Regions:
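N-terminal secretory/membrane-targeting segments
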Residues: 1-89, 110-129, 164-168, 172, ...
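Solvent-exposed soluble domains appended to multi-pass membrane proteins
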Residues: 76-87, 95-96, 101-445
C-alpha cells in the first residue's frame, strides 16, 4: 500500500510540475522532431506526453452555435468554381523527400548548380519558403498538413495523425475536395505502400488509386537502397492516362531519404561539395547534394512530360523537411529550421506571386489561384486567413471534424468510406514458388 501511495504521490507531483513547466514555457507541447525533444526535455516527459496526449483536446468555446458562426450557414461545405470542366487543370503535387534549395546553405558551396531546373522554375513561377511542421524527419506530418489543410500544432506532441487517426477513420482531404468537381484522384509513392500506413490513409482520404513501390518495376536505386525518383514520371503519366477527365495526382518521392553515408560511396560524383573540413560530414553532404541533383533532373523530366500532354496543368513541388544532418539555424540563409522551398509551375498563365506559406495552407492557396473553392478546411483558409480568431477558430474546426460532433457537416460528411484500389493495372497471379530456406516467390503480370 505504501508503495502504491508513493507512486500516486509521485504521479501527482510530476503532473503538477509538468503543468507549471508547460505554463512557463520551460517545456513545449509541440515536438517538431521527436529525437530532438527527447534530448531537450528528457525521457519521462516526452514518453508520457507522446503516449497519452494524442488527438485534439476539446477547445474552450466548442458549441454548436460557435461552429455555426464559423461555418456561416454552410458556406464551408460549398463547392464552386468559375471554370468550365474543359478549363479545370490537372493538378500534380510532388513532395520531394528531404529537399531544400542547397544554395541556401551558408557553410558549403557546390562545384556547380545542384538544382538548375528548380532554380529556373523559381525565377519564372510562384515560389517561396515552405514552412513545414517537422525537421529532419516527419514526412507524413507534412503530407497530412498539405492534404487536409489542418495544422499539426493542435495535435499531441510528436503525434502522427496518419497513424493515430487517418489510418482508421475517413478523412476529408484534397482528394475528396477535387473529386467533387469530377477529378480522378491518384496517389503515388516509390516506397512501400504500408510505410506510415499510407495504403489505409489514402483509402480513407478518398483517393481512387494508389501506386506504391510494389506496383513499380524499380531498377535504379541510390547507393543506400532507396528508389530513384526518375521512375515516378512514367507512373504519373500512366495514372493520368487512366481517366478521360482532369486528374489530381499526389506524389511522394523517396530518393533524398537518409541515412547519409559518412564514407564516399559515389565513385565519380557529378557535384562536389567544398568548404567542409570534416571528411565524414563532407561525404554525407556530397551524397545528399548529388541526390538533390538527380531529384532536380526528375523535376525537369516531369515538367517536360506534362508540357507534351498539351493539357491545362499545374504542378507543385515542395520539400517535406530538411535532411537529418544536425543543421542549426545559423547554417541557413533563412535562419529557420522549419523552412524548405516550394514552387507552383503552370501552363495556364497564372500570375507569378511569390510568398512564404505554411504547409497547411498550400492546397487552399493553389485552389484559390485556380478559382476553385471546395473542401471544408480549404474553404475556411480561403475565407478566413488573416482575419481575427483565424487560428483559434481553425482549432475549433479541426476538433469538430475529427473528434467533435461534426456540426459543420450537418449530417453529410464528404467521405464515409474509401473505395481505393492499389495500382492502376489489373494484376494476375500465375504461380507461387517456395524458396529453399523459407518464404515464397510470387509470379504474375
Amino acid at each position: 500500500i505504501a508503495a502504491l501511495i508513493g507512486i500516486i504521490v509521485c504521479g501527482v507531483l510530476y503532473t503538477f510540475v509538468t503543468n507549471i513547466a508547460i505554463d512557463k514555457r520551460v517545456v513545449s507541447t509541440y515536438f517538431g522532431n521527436i529525437a530532438f525533444a527527447y534530448e531537450d526535455y528528457g525521457l519521462p516527459y516526452c514518453f508520457s506526453a507522446s503516449l497519452f496526449n494524442t488527438g485534439i483536446s476539446e477547445p474552450n468555446g466548442y458549441t454548436k452555435k460557435a461552429m455555426a458562426k464559423i461555418d456561416k450557414d454552410g458556406e464551408l461545405n460549398q463547392t464552386a468554381t468559375s471554370r468550365s470542366s474543359d478549363e479545370l487543370p490537372n493538378i500534380i503535387v510532388v513532395q520531394l523527400e528531404s529537399y531544400f534549395d542547397v544554395a541556401n546553405a551558408e557553410f558549403f558551396t557546390t562545384s556547380e548548380d545542384a538544382c538548375p531546373n528548380l532554380h529556373n522554375l523559381y525565377q519564372n513561377y510562384s515560389n517561396g519558403y515552405f514552412k513545414v511542421p517537422s525537421v529532419g524527419a516527419g514526412t507524413a506530418n507534412t503530407e497530412f498538413e498539405v492534404l487536409t489543410g489542418m495544422n499539426l500544432r493542435y495535435f499531441g506532441p510528436g503525434e502522427y495523425p496518419y497513424k493515430t487517426y487517418s489510418k482508421k477513420h475517413p478523412t476529408e482531404s484534397a482528394a475528396t475536395a477535387l473529386a467533387s468537381l469530377g477529378y480522378g484522384t491518384h496517389a503515388l509513392h516509390d516506397n512501400t505502400g504500408n510505410f506510415y500506413s499510407r495504403a489505409n490513409v489514402f483509402n480513407n482520404m478518398g483517393f481512387d488509386t494508389f501506386t506504391s513501390k510494389e506496383f513499380m518495376n524499380v531498377l535504379q536505386t541510390t547507393e543506400n537502397g532507396w528508389a530513384k525518383d526518375e521512375i515516378l514520371t512514367h507512373h504519373i503519366m500512366e495514372a493520368m492516362d487512366t481517366t478521360k477527365q482532369e486528374d489530381f495526382v499526389f506524389t511522394v518521392s523517396v530518393q533524398g531519404h537518409g541515412n547519409y553515408p559518412e564514407t564516399q560511396v559515389i565513385e565519380n560524383p557529378k557535384i562536389k561539395v567544398e568548404g567542409i573540413e570534416d571528411e565524414a560530414l563532407k561525404n554525407k553532404w556530397e551524397y545528399y547534394v548529388n541526390q538533390v541533383y538527380e531529384m532536380d533532373q526528375f523535376v525537369g523530366d516531369l515538367i517536360k512530360a506534362v508540357e507534351e500532354r498539351n493539357e491545362p496543368s499545374v504542378v507543385v513541388f515542395y520539400g517535406d523537411h530538411l535532411p537529418t544532418m544536425g543543421l542549426k539555424a545559423e547554417d541557413l540563409k533563412s535562419r529557420y529550421l522549419y523552412n524548405t522551398n516550394y514552387v507552383i509551375w503552370d501552363n495556364i498563365g497564372l500570375q507569378k506571386h511569390d510568398k512564404n506559406i505554411p504547409a497547411y495552407q498550400l492546397m487552399s492557396e493553389v485552389l484559390n489561384r485556380l478559382d476553385i473553392h471546395s473542401g471544408t478546411v480549404f474553404n475556411y483558409h480561403q475565407q478566413r486567413k488573416g482575419t481575427k480568431n483565424y487560428l483559434s477558430d481553425l482549432e475549433l474546426l479541426q476538433y469538430d471534424i475529427l473528434y467533435g460532433k461534426q456540426y459543420v457537416y450537418n449530417g453529410k460528411a464528404p467521405i464515409t468510406e474509401g473505395h481505393m484500389v492499389m495500382g492502376i493495372r489489373n494484376v494476375s497471379l500465375s504461380s507461387i514458388v517456395p524458396q529453399l530456406n523459407s518464404g515464397y516467390s510470387l509470379y504474375g503480370e
